[in-house]
Structure formats: structure tokens, C-alpha cells
Curated annotation (Swiss-Prot):
Cofactor(s) it depends on: pyridoxal 5'-phosphate
One Pfam family matching this protein: MOSC
Cystine bridges: none
InterPro entries in alphabetical order: Aminotrans_V_dom, MoCF_Sase_C, MoCo_sulfurase, MOCOS_middle, PyrdxlP-dep_Trfase, PyrdxlP-dep_Trfase_major, PyrdxlP-dep_Trfase_small
EC code(s) of this entry: 2.8.1.9
Reactions accelerated catalytically: Mo-molybdopterin + L-cysteine + AH2 = thio-Mo-molybdopterin + L-alanine + A + H2O
Keyword Transferase: yes
Record SUPFAM superfamilies: MOSC N-terminal domain-like, PLP-dependent transferases
GO biological process, one term: Mo-molybdopterin cofactor biosynthetic process
Role summary: Sulfurates the molybdenum cofactor. Sulfation of molybdenum is essential for xanthine dehydrogenase (XDH) and aldehyde oxidase (ADO) enzymes in which molybdenum cofactor is liganded by 1 oxygen and 1 sulfur atom in active form.
Protein name: Molybdenum cofactor sulfurase
Signal peptide bounds: none
Keywords from the named record: Molybdenum cofactor biosynthesis, Pyridoxal phosphate, Transferase
């Protein structure tokens, strides 16, 4: 493709739209205020006027079940017929040549085709698919009894097509491919369908299935030439319009013969059926009538009418959307490709097919990439996505349900992926880098309503947080001579978190608090579980959990709980009670440690009063559960640095986390370790960094954060009058162990605490904000991990005395802390 001039390319920006895209956004997409949405390949967004139009339609008309004969039912049937025709015309599909079957989504359309082929022949069918296929296309191979093949390159497909003319196989064959990769936007040749049809004209048993879900989101699908069109086209309307949640299967009527062999039939698809005696039925005559099982989602179909009208009014045509998004995608791609660190190392590794050049036939508005630091090390995709989320930038990371494209882009082989799976890699987890290679890919995708500000915001985000503009020699610990001074630390505060992810109970001054091998007494002994899934709730997903505040009343033997400003109070006995046992997972998705994703047995409180107390406050069906005493405790696994050990510390260096011991300490419902420690001096230094962290002129000034956002059990502080007011932030990074109190209780340091965006939840308001995570990313990134605080546990030597006799261990606010430096 010849290069276009800058003026000519700029003319593509929102050309043909009813108004400037910024004006459309302000009026039609109020939820985009202060938000950068770059996940249009997941779903594009619905305009306000679409919802208003649909609401008017529903409130002005009475729509009945289309299978009835009443006037309301006939109205529904009439509207469905009209909208079916309108949808076909949207894709330039002649209703004499094509029929459209309404389904739930593109995956449902694919499954419907596969079901048809499964029943088409006693011999079964053969299935071929392209490497860029979505998981839903790959899954069809499991039903292909005559075998299957994954085509790795376009050349392989072309050679297979060339051989069809001499192929005498007489069983049905189906070739499926995506019109556009949902991973990187690579577009496959549309002419394959015609080539396959022409090449197999003698046999007439080779069919094509086009997954158009990603393609149609920003590009016109032209089916005007029925001879060149796919036999089956699967798509989702929400990818185009944002709403309704509805899909379609477009079928060439010349392929209707194989459809008639489908065995299953549902309500509304037959003219008559005998329920007893002879198993006989007569299917309806049209393609859509015999494939649309049961009552159609007629309200969603009616909403499609409003979607088509609104989209046309705002954007004119899909060609306009295509030009607009192509301009933006090329602009963003070029900016990311040009980014370099101070030493010339590229910041972004872009995964774009060599065959793609942002021509409409080869590339869609999707950019797939990963980020490297100045030394070439990969930045974890999860960290980037978490930080983007904090900055209100919506992107996606992972394999994107496109395992073939991801593996090919990253250079993973099948055996290597199986080894990764055995090592714990799962879809959606935080295993970002294994064997020195990324396990997933970052993706930004553009849509009709994307604008230049979206591009600029994302480019600024990468520039601010991931471009190293000069060599950094950040002193993470004080100079050597300061480290060697006689330390003078004390316990400033003790916090117990009885309910996982909820508020803290502050241990009163002057009260000694029992500490066990699994942590402070009563810490993380309870959790809230979803009554439907059994998964433990997390503040990451439900920030209002921070406002659930427990108080441990040892005198009365109860846990008193309040929620926000509500005066209602719930009391739960500290004594063990018999409750229903349920199995639950600590997180809904697997994490890099062995904590989140563990299946643990907890005792769920069966009282409706308990369940409603928490459910009403959080707005989610949940109840309280407790870690039972008879069940073995879990094993801690704190995040560890990958640095080699170095006993002799140089100024400005960061020490190796202690090597794992042969026996890891147990934990209850804590995420990674029995006890978490932070220092007041480190919090103060972080707040100084937050204050002086450069910010865009339009952003609000950042506020200092409280130590409570880090949810530490122990906060240590320094006696500054003994040190001439010389605070030593992050000196705890050098600690190998420490002792506390008059009895010199010994604690082992297990490693550094890796941080996520949970620290952005204000513990007093339950609201999310950017800090401190945004500043931590800049100042506390160690080996591509954002760390703050230290995981600790009571030393094994403190757990018994004499002949295995239990030893009582306690700590108190004000106790002296004596560290042992690594």
C-alpha cells in the first residue's frame, strides 16, 4: 500500500460521522468521562440514545411471545421478520441468497454449525481451522470424527486449496477461520471462501465457516457476492453496537441441504411432532425456522432495531468507522513503535504480522504488544494492566482466547506450554513470565467512538511509567554508614484483620496480644463467601468491604461487626460453633502464589441474619465463613525476588529475599504469609514521593496515604530523638530477622510483599484512587515487582520450650524491635 500524506490520513478521522467524535462522546457516552476505554475488541460501548430509543419502544408497545397468536405476539413476529431483513441488508446480504439465524453470540453460532456437521454423515466430518482461530473455533475439532488440522500459515491454506481439485474424499469437510484475529488484528483473505468453493466444485462437500465477530466490530462485511461468500458466518452484534447481547449465524441458502440433516429439534422448529408411538416429526421449511430452537430473545432482537438506527445516525456507515479506527490505530502503533529507553532499547515489542500494513484487507484496529525495560527484561502484563486500571485505562491482557496466535507470537511450543501448565500456568493468572518469556500479550483495541485523546492518554501512560529516560541508581536503603548505626525501633501499632479483606481491629495500647505460628490471634480467621459461587470476596472487587469494621471483645468472647455508618451491629461468638461446611476458593482466578486459587474448607454461617447483614451492605449475596480448627492450616508462599544472594551489601543495593526454608510457616486466610510488617519511615518517604511526583496539569493533587492502606499487622517506627531526626526509610528491606519485646521474641523475614491495586482502596471511605500504587510503580519496582513491606513469621525456635511444651508468645504496642541485618 502506498504511503498516504499526513493531510489525507487525517481526513479519515471521524469522516462521515454526524458530528465530531468528541461531541458525540460527550453527549452519548457520559460514562467515558475521565476514562480511557481501549478494549473495543472485547465489546464496544453503547450510546445513551440507543438505550433511550429501546426504552421508548418497550414502553410504547406491547410485545408478546412470538409463538402465540395474539395481537401482541403478532407484533413481535412482525418486528422480528423486519429486523432480520434489516440485519441482512446491513451486511449487503440478499435475502434470496442468505438467511439469518438469531443466536446468543458468535460462539453459539459456531456450535450450531458444528452440531449440524456432527449429524450430517454417519462417517463424521473433517475439520480444518487457521492458527489465529478463537478458542470457540478450536473447540470444534473435538467433534470432527474424520480428523482435523490446524493450518499454521496462509501458505498452508493456499496449498490445501490447490489440492482440493484432485481430492476425492466423499465425507463432509468444514474449514473455519477468523476474518480478523481478535489477538492482533491480522485479517485473513476473504477470497479463501470462493477459492475453496471453486476448487471443490466437483465434490461439493467442502464448506466454509467465517468467524466474523472481531472483523465486523469496525469493518463492513460485504456479502453482496453470494458466490464468494462463506457458507456460514458467525458474529455478535454487541461487538458492533455495544448492545444488545445478541449474535447471528448467516447461512448461504445453497448450503441448506446439510442443515436439514440436523437431528435435534426444539420448540417452534417443527410443523408437527409425534410424542408417542412412531418417532416422527416434520421440520419447518426455512433455515431460521428450523434452527431457532425455543422462544427467541425477542426483546433483544427488538433492541437491535434501535441499535441499527442509532449507529447509522451517529456514524453513517461501517466504512466510516473503518477509516476512523484505521487512522487512530496506525497513529498509536507508530507512537508505540518509536518509544525507546535512554540506551536505545525499544520499550514496546509489537506483535504484528509481516503481511499487515494497516490496509483494510490486512489489518484491523488492534495492537498487541509487550513491554521491556532498558535492560531488555519483560515487564509483567498483569502489572501493566493493574496500573492501567488504577489510571482508569481499560485494556486487556493474557492469551485473549486465542491460544494459537499467542503461542505463535511468543514462540511457545506445545510441549513447552504443557510444562508451563504443570508448573501452574492457568488462563487469567499472574504467571507473567516463565523461562524468560512472556506467557501472554497486552492488547489495545479501538472502536467507532475512540478519539485522539484516547491515543494520547495511553501513550502518556507508557511514557510516564515505562520509559526509562536516564539510568536510575535509586538508593533503596540508606548509605552503609547509616545502616551500621545502632538501631532503635519500636512497635507503633498492631492491627488484626479478623475478616479477610475487611477493616482492621487496632490492638489497644497496653494490651499484650497473643501471636501464633500462623500469625496474630484471630487474624484472617473469617472471610465472606459468595453464596452462589462459594468464592471468597476480595476488597479488590468489592472496595466497600473496607468499611466492614470488626472489634474483638475478649471479655465477652464475641466479634462485634459494624458496616459503614450504619448503627446496626452483628455479634459472632469467638468460640467455635458447628456450622455448615462448604468448600471455597480464596480467589475466583488463580494467582502466581499458591494462595489465591487454593481450595480450602471453611465453616459457613447458616444464619439468614448473618447473610443479610453483609449482603445488604455490599449488594452481593454473601455470608460469613470461618477457618475451622480441625482443618490443617495452609502453607505460606511469599513473593520472592529472583536475585542471587549477596551477603555483603553495597550502598543503594537491594538485598536478596531470604532463601526458602525447608518448612514454610502455616497461614489461615492470609494471602501470602502469617504476618506483614511495614515501617513508618517508609510510609513517610512514600508520601514525600507522592507529593513531588509530577502530575498532568488537569489532574487533582494527590493526597498522602495512611499506613493502613497497606494492611500490615505490625507497623514499626524509629525513635527519632536518638537518631538526630534521621529517618531510615526502607531499611526493613535489609532485615533478615528481628526480635520484639522484653522476651526478645524472634521473627524470620520471609520476603518482600508484592503489591497490587488493592492499596488504592481508601480504608476510611471504601473508594478507589490512584495512589499509592502509581508512585510505588515508579519508586519501588524490584525485578519487575512492585514491593512494599516484608512478610514475616514467628521463628521456629519460639514455638516450643523444653520437651515440646507450647510457649505463650505475645507482643504489645511500644515493644522494642531489634533487627538483624542481612
Amino acid at each position: 500500500m502506498q504511503a498516504k500524506s499526513k493531510t489525507e490520513s487525517r481526513a479519515e478521522y471521524c469522516t462521515g460521522y454526524s458530528e465530531d467524535v468528541d461531541v458525540i462522546r460527550e453527549r452519548e457516552y457520559p460514562f467515558l468521562k475521565d476514562t480511557t476505554y481501549l478494549d473495543h475488541a472485547g465489546t464496544t460501548l453503547y450510546p445513551k440514545s440507543l438505550i433511550d430509543s429501546f426504552a421508548r419502544d418497550l414502553t410504547s408497545n406491547l410485545f408478546g411471545n412470538p409463538h402465540s397468536r395474539s395481537s401482541s405476539s403478532q407484533l413481535s413476529t412482525q418486528r422480528i421478520d423486519d429486523i432480520r431483513l434489516r440485519a441482512l441488508r446491513f451486511f449487503n446480504a440478499d435475502p434470496d441468497e442468505f438467511d439469518l439465524v438469531f443466536v446468543a453470540n458468535a460462539t453459539a453460532a459456531i456450535k450450531l454449525v458444528v452440531d449440524v456437521f456432527r449429524d450430517s454423515s454417519p462417517q463424521g466430518f473433517w475439520y480444518g481451522y487457521f492458527i489465529d482461530a478463537h478458542t470457540s473455533l478450536v473447540g470444534a475439532r473435538e467433534i470432527a470424527e474424520r480428523g482435523h488440522r490446524c493450518f499454521l500459515t496462509s501458505g498452508e491454506v493456499e496449498r490445501w486449496i490447490a489440492d482440493l481439485a484432485t481430492d476425492q474424499k466423499n465425507f463432509p469437510r468444514l474449514f473455519a477461520y477468523p476474518g480478523q484475529s481478535n489477538l492482533n488484528g491480522r485479517r485473513s483473505p476473504m477470497q479463501w471462501c470462493k477459492k475453496i468453493r471453486d476448487g471443490s466444485s466437483g465434490a461439493g462437500n467442502v464448506y466454509t465457516l467465517l468467524d466474523a465477530a472481531s472483523l465486523v466490530s469496525t469493518s463492513p462485511l460485504d456479502l453482496s457476492d453470494a458466490s464468494a461468500a462463506p457458507d456460514f458466518t458467525a458474529l455478535s452484534f454487541y461487538k458492533i453496537f455495544g448492545f444488545p447481547d445478541l449474535g447471528a449465524l448467516i447461512v448461504r441458502k445453497s448450503a441448506a441441504g446439510i442443515i436439514k440433516k440436523r437431528k435435534f429439534f426444539g420448540g417452534g422448529t417443527v410443523d408437527m411432532v409425534l410424542a408417542q408411538g412412531m418417532p416422527w416429526h416434520a421440520k419447518k421449511s426455512t433455515i431460521h425456522e428450523c434452527l431457532e430452537d425455543g422462544t427467541l430473545p425477542f426483546h433483544n432482537i427488538i433492541a437491535l432495531d434501535s441499535a441499527l438506527s442509532t449507529h447509522g445516525r451517529l456514524f453513517g456507515s461501517m466504512s466510516n468507522v473503518s477509516f476512523h479506527t484505521r487512522y487512530l490505530a496506525k497513529r498509536l502503533h507508530n507512537r508505540l513503535a518509536a518509544m525507546t529507553h535512554f540506551n536505545g532499547q525499544k520499550v514496546c515489542h509489537l506483535y504484528m504480522s509481516p503481511e499487515s500494513d494497516f490496509d483494510n484487507s490486512t489489518q484491523g484496529p488492534i495492537i498487541a504488544f509487550n513491554i521491556r525495560n532498558s535492560s531488555g527484561a519483560w515487564i509483567g502484563k498483569s502489572e501493566v494492566e493493574r496500573l492501567a486500571n488504577v489510571k482508569k485505562i481499560h485494556i486487556r491482557s493474557g492469551s485473549h482466547c486465542n491460544s494459537g496466535g499467542t503461542a505463535t507470537s511468543l514462540g511457545w511450543t506445545g510441549p513447552e506450554l504443557l510444562r508451563n501448565f504443570s508448573a501452574g500456568l492457568r488462563c487469567g493468572d499472574d504467571h507473567d513470565v516463565m523461562d524468560g518469556r512472556p506467557t501472554g500479550i497486552l492488547r489495545v483495541s479501538l472502536g467507532a467512538v475512540s478519539n485522539l485523546r484516547d491515543i494520547d492518554a495511553f501513550a502518556r501512560f507508557i511514557d510516564e511509567f515505562y520509559i526509562e529516560k536516564e539510568p536510575e541508581f535509586v538508593s533503596l536503603v540508606p548509605p552503609m554508614e547509616v545502616v551500621l548505626q545502632e538501631p532503635s525501633f519500636y512497635v507503633e501499632s498492631l492491627s488484626v484483620y479478623p475478616i479477610k479483606s475487611c477493616g482492621a481491629f487496632k490492638v489497644p495500647d497496653g494490651q499484650r496480644w497473643e501471636i501464633k505460628r500462623e500469625g496474630l490471634a484471630w487474624d484472617r480467621e473469617w472471610c465472606l463467601i459468595h453464596q452462589g459461587t462459594g468464592a471468597a470476596l476480595s476488597m479488590k472487587k468489592y472496595p466497600r468491604m473496607a468499611l466492614i469494621r470488626p472489634v474483638i471483645d475478649l471479655e465477652r468472647g464475641v466479634l462485634r461487626i459494624t458496616c459503614g455508618s450504619d448503627s446496626k451491629e452483628l455479634e459472632v461468638s469467638l468460640r467455635r460453633e458447628i456450622t455448615n461446611l462448604v468448600t471455597t476458593s480464596l480467589c475466583q482466578s488463580a494467582k502466581s502464589s499458591n494462595v489465591c486459587g487454593d481450595r480450602v474448607v471453611v465453616q459457613a454461617y447458616s444464619s439468614p441474619t448473618v447473610a443479610s447483614f453483609f449482603s445488604n451492605f455490599l449488594g452481593v449475596p454473601c455470608t460469613l465463613a470461618r477457618f475451622p480448627p480441625q482443618i490443617s492450616t495452609r502453607i505460606s508462599n511469599p513473593t520472592r525476588s529472583s536475585r542471587r544472594s549477596q551477603r555483603a551489601l553495597m550502598p543503594g543495593s537491594f538485598p536478596e529475599d531470604p532463601s526458602p526454608t525447608s518448612e514454610q510457616p502455616p497461614i489461615l486466610l492470609s494471602n501470602e504469609s502469617p504476618i506483614l510488617l511495614i515501617s513508618r519511615s517508609s510510609v513517610n518517604r512514600l508520601n514525600e514521593n507522592i507529593k513531588y511526583n509530577p502530575r498532568p496539569s488537569y489532574s487533582t493533587p494527590a493526597k498522602a496515604v495512611e499506613a493502613d492502606v497497606f494492611r500490615a499487622n505490625i507497623v514499626v517506627a524509629e525513635n527519632l530523638h536518638q537518631l538526630a531526626n534521621a529517618e531510615r526509610p526502607y531499611i526493613e528491606d535489609t532485615w533478615e530477622s528481628f526480635s520484639v519485646g522484653p522476651e526478645q521474641l524472634c521473627f524470620d523475614v520471609l520476603g518482600s510483599c508484592q503489591r497490587c491495586q488493592m492499596v488504592c482502596v481508601d480504608p476510611y471511605t471504601g473508594t478507589r484512587r490512584e495512589e499509592p500504587y502509581s508512585t510505588l510503580v515508579k519508586t519501588r519496582k524490584i525485578n519487575s515487582k512492585i514491593v512494599f513491606g516484608r512478610h514475616t513469621s514467628l521463628s521456629n525456635m519460639e514455638l516450643s520450650q523444653g520437651a515440646g511444651k507450647p510457649k505463650s508468645c505475645t507482643v504489645m504496642v511500644g515493644d522494642v524491635v531489634t533487627p538483624q541485618i542481612a
